[in-house]
């Protein structure tokens, strides 16, 4: 079941498209790049293919495949983007549909969860003011394609 007005559901139905398209999907989960405008190359979103807002409501099958999806996504990101660290998190406040942010932190970015979140918010604000640069859809699509190829070989 998908829900009207849910951003994640809109992406799943194709009403909104992530640059580079679907990187990986199985019966329960989809991996795509974050939506435009793109803040960081390789900033991925893993989302459940049905609308669900509570991890406790995952089916046994959905829950049992999540770990391998996260691990394989991080492995591909490690080899393609080569970040210093990969952060995986889920807030579910603005977009309640279960999804996980997979954030590659380069060595030039601050270490620490709170510092990283503040850095990303400042970077976004500077980009919105025209004082920074968004990642182009072409670069995002190229990274997505490399990640897709890597995941095809490993899963």
What are these regions (language model features)?
Residues 1-155:
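HIT superfamily nucleotide-processing domains
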């Amino acid at each position: 079941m998908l829900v009207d007005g849910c951003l994640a559901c809109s992406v799943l139905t194709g009403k909104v498209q992530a640059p580079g398209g679907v990187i990986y999907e199985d019966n329960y989960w989809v991996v795509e790049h974050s939506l435009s405008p793109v803040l960081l190359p390789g900033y991925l979103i893993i989302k459940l293919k049905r609308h669900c807002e509570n991890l406790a409501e995952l089916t046994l099958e959905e829950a049992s495949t999540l770990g391998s999806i996260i691990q394989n996504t991080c492995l591909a990101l490690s080899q393609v983007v080569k970040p210093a660290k990969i952060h995986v998190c889920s807030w579910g406040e603005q977009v309640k549909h279960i999804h996980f942010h997979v954030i590659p932190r380069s060595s030039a970015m601050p270490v620490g969860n709170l510092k990283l979140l503040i850095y990303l918010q400042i970077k976004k604000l500077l980009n919105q003011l025209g004082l920074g640069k968004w990642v182009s859809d072409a670069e995002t699509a190229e990274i997505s394609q490399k990640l897709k190829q890597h995941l095809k070989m490993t899963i």
